[in-house]
Every structure is written in structure tokens, then in C-alpha cells.
Amino acid sequence: MSALVYFSSSSENTHRFMQRLGLPATRIPLNERERIQVDEPYILVVPSYGGGGMAGAVPRQVIRFLNDEHNRARIRGVIASGNRNFGDAWGCAGDVIAQKCGVPWLYRFELMGTQRDIDNVRKGVNEFWQQLPRSA
């Protein structure tokens, strides 16, 4: 299985989800001055921001991470979290990233996710990597 990369704000909702998921993962730093590079294909797990609009939905740290060509070339899919209070824009950061990076939007969950979300993501991530061509 390949990597998961995620961002979590200071609310730590996405971080708690990732801890419960129990799969190897790299966190995009909260501090925008810190940078990371990922050297293998990965699925990005990202919260949605902005109170329900598309503008500002993707966290700045994630934009900076994906603006690095090295990182952008290795993204293979996206999983988004959000708040159902955002209505149609729930998890819309996943939409934005999938469209801009040309990768599938694999799943979305609310806030810290439920046990069902954890189970679905574990299963889905495993199946995704098994179906993806080795050269991808």
C-alpha cells in the first residue's frame, strides 16, 4: 500500500480521524513555513474550509503543498472532510482538488468521521491501491 498525506487544522478533527484509521500517513505542517515533499504516490486527506463556499475551501497549507510540482505529480486521489452544515459545499475541497489535479474524489466524511467512515476508508484505500497500475 502506498501513502496517505493529510492536513489537519488546530481543531485536530482530521488528525483524530487519521489516528483512528491507523494507516501510515504524513501530515502537512500547520506552520506554512515548514515544507514537506512526498516521494511516492499518495492519497490526500483534506478538510474543507470557508463556511460553505468554494472560495477558500482548500486550506492554504494544502495549496502550497500541491503547488510544489514534485508533490502534485504524485497525488493519486483525494478524500475530503467537512461539515454537513455547509450544505452542497460539504467536503468541497475534495471537488476542487480532484478537478485541479485530475484525480478521483474517493470519499468524504463529516468532522472526525464515524466508525463506518473509518471502515469504508480503510477498505476503499486498500482496494484503490490494488486496482491502480503499478506505474501510476
From Swiss-Prot:
GO biological process: protein modification process
Taxonomy, superkingdom: Bacteria
InterPro entries in the record: Flavoprotein-like_sf, RNR_Ib_NrdI_bac, RNR_NrdI
Gene Ontology MF annotations: FMN binding
Role noted for this protein: Probably involved in ribonucleotide reductase function.
Family: Belongs to the NrdI family.
Protein name, per record: Protein NrdI
Gene it is expressed from: nrdI
